[in-house]
């Protein structure tokens, strides 16, 4: 029975820490809201660079059809 209480306490502690890691940077949210995707490398055609992600560490790319 003690193990059950210990397990519940540990799980409660772990789930308390989770929301801090789920908060995204504002630029990442803006990229996703404009239907872009984050990329480690430069955007490849037909995608265009529309901003940054992860606090400026990544590129935000959006597919742009060629006309």
Swiss-Prot record:
Residues 20-25 form a propeptide. GO terms for biological process: cell chemotaxis; defense response to bacterium; defense response to fungus; defense response to Gram-negative bacterium; killing of cells of another organism. Changing residue 2 to G: In strain: Xinghua. Disulfide bonds join 31-60, 38-53, 43-61. Strong expression in the testis, liver, gall bladder, kidney, esophagus and crop. Also expressed in the glandular stomach, ovary and male and female reproductive tracts. Low expression in the intestinal tract. Expressed in the ovarian stroma, but not in the ovarian follicles. SUPFAM superfamilies: Defensin-like. The keyword Secreted applies. InterPro entries: Defensin_beta-like. Residues 1-19 form the signal peptide. One of its GO terms (cellular component) is cytoplasm. It is found in: Secreted; Cytoplasmic granule. Keywords: Antibiotic, Antimicrobial, Defensin, Disulfide bond, Fungicide, Secreted, Signal. GO terms for molecular function: CCR6 chemokine receptor binding; chemoattractant activity. The keyword Membrane does not apply. Pfam families: Defensin_beta. PANTHER family: BETA-DEFENSIN 1, BETA-DEFENSIN-RELATED. Has bactericidal activity. Potent activity against C.jejuni, C.perfringens, S.aureus, C.albicans and S.cerevisiae. Less potent against S.typhimurium and E.coli. Belongs to the beta-defensin family. This is Gallinacin-9. It comes from Gallus gallus (Chicken).
